[in-house]
A protein has these predicted regions:
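Extreme N-terminal tail/first-helix region
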Residues: 1-13
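Residue-level recognition of alpha-helical structural elements
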Residues: 3-6, 34, 38, 79-83, ...
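Short, contiguous alpha-helical
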Residues: 11-12, 22, 30-72, 112-156
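Amphipathic alpha-helical packing segments from all-alpha helical-bundle domains
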Residues: 17-24
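Short, flexible helix-adjacent loops and helix caps
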Residues: 26-33, 103-106
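Acidic/histidine-rich alpha-helical segments that form the ligand environment
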Residues: 75-112, 119-138
């Protein structure tokens, strides 16, 4: 097994997630992006997904754990083009973070997180990937609800 096989796989999964968020934005009519169903809007779920990735990648590379909430507000990222631009910034942060991980052994190291409890890098990355993918799934479900497809065929 190569020294960076796991790191590369994690990097690819985060890259796929960001790319799927771009595809999702491009597939949604502009009037639906911030339309609110009984839950959170499509755009807000997409941005929460990307923000989770941005926060962890910023924490890993420059120990900046700020919540991207302020610069991911609907007023700031008000259309698909601005959201795509933000995803490019998140993708750049992802690349920097994964370039900083030297090999698979580095994933077993502990990192300091805002909660004060150190955690293993691998666990932090996996938790973030799960959280970001969950928000992506919520965005997809909201698209189905708003487009009238309902929840038939959903696997719960």
């Amino acid at each position: 097994m190569a020294k960076t096989e796991i790191v590369n796989q994690l990097d690819q999964e985060f890259g796929r997630l960001i790319e799927s968020l771009r595809d999702l934005i491009n597939s949604v009519p502009p009037d639906l992006l911030y339309r609110n169903p009984p839950a959170v809007s499509i755009a807000e779920n997409i941005l929460r997904s990307a923000a989770a990735v941005e926060q962890v990648c910023g924490g890993i590379t420059v120990n900046l754990w700020d919540d991207p909430f302020e610069w991911t507000l609907p007023e700031t990222l008000s259309n698909a083009a601005l959201m795509i631009e933000y995803l490019s910034e998140v993708d750049l942060a992802r690349r920097r973070a994964f370039n900083a991980i030297s090999d698979d052994e580095a994933l077993s190291k502990y990192v300091s997180v805002p909660s004060g409890e150190p955690c293993r890098l691998a666990g932090l990355l996996l938790d973030t990937l799960v959280t970001a993918a969950d928000y992506r799934g919520r965005a997809l479900a909201t698209i189905k609800i708003l487009s009238g497809e309902g929840t038939q065929g959903f696997i719960i």
